[in-house]
């Protein structure tokens, strides 16, 4: 069997189209995943989840009392006190809702932290192929919404990479000495300024290698979206081979293109590490 370069040149436009699709999915997925991962990582790192039995019991009591008051108000409004103006009943309802908001507002960070940990556990514990199949085939049945292949692939990569980036962010933040956080508090800085000006720059330098590795993994994971027919690089290679039966040439070209893309990421990573290192 002879190696035919002409098969590669003939397929080159389709391979470039697949490469561009791969780059789009990867870039959009990583941008969205970085936002999700950064928020989840910060919440998981700085918000403790455990709730004491005492606070839980008081919360249940307050919730039960609020529900009872609302039901009592509805019964009185329809029966014995039907002549009371509606404004009075609405004022009572708003007061009860304000009480609930006051009691449970402090629980919002705890709920977010718990949900973030569940999200990370579920996504890291399931294959990305299962995730994209669920989003592309099962989710439209649940919400009655049509999702195209490109959107399903991009959203899946966002969700998948976000879980891993959250762990990268958590590890980076926890690697920073606690003394820096305490120093920021001693200076009277709010949390967001401590994170942005003191802890963030130090943690970011330590996260660069693992973030670069995650970028490469996400790029290669995009090839798995072949299962839903997205016209990325691997899918294009498969369709080309179905037409010309030149598997050696086409898969070789596909492999070289992936190596070039991952090599560019590695070079960019080395440049960023060089620019951000502390001399």
Language model: regions and residue ranges:
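Transmembrane alpha-helices and adjacent helix-loop boundaries
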Residues: 1-279
């Amino acid at each position: 069997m002879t190696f035919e370069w002409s098969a590669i040149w003939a397929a080159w436009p389709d391979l470039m189209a697949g490469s561009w699709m791969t780059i789009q999915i990867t870039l959009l997925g990583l941008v969205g995943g970085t936002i999700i991962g950064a928020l989840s990582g910060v919440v998981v790192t700085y918000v403790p989840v455990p709730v004491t039995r005492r606070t839980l019991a008081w919360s249940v009591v307050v919730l039960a009392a609020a529900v009872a008051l609302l039901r009592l108000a509805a019964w009185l409004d329809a029966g014995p006190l039907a002549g009371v103006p509606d404004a009075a009943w609405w004022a009572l309802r708003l007061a009860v809702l304000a009480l609930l908001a006051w009691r449970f507002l402090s629980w919002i960070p705890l709920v977010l932290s718990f949900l973030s940990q569940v999200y990370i556990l579920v996504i890291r514990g399931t294959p990305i192929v299962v995730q994209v199949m669920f989003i592309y085939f099962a989710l439209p049945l649940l919400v009655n919404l049509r999702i195209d292949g490109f959107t399903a692939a991009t959203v899946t990569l966002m969700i998948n990479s976000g879980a891993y980036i959250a762990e990268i962010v958590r590890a980076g933040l926890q690697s920073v000495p606690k003394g820096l956080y305490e120093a920021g508090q001693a200076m009277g800085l709010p949390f967001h300024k401590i994170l942005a000006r003191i802890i963030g720059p130090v943690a970011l330098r330590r996260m660069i290698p693992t973030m670069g590795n995650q970028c490469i993994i996400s790029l290669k994971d995009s090839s798995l979206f072949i299962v839903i027919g997205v016209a990325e690089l691997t899918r294009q290679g498969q369709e080309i081979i179905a037409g010309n039966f030149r598997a050696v040439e086409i898969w070789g070209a596909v492999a070289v293109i992936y190596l070039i893309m991952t090599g560019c990421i590695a070079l960019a990573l080395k440049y960023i590490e060089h620019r951000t290192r502390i001399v």
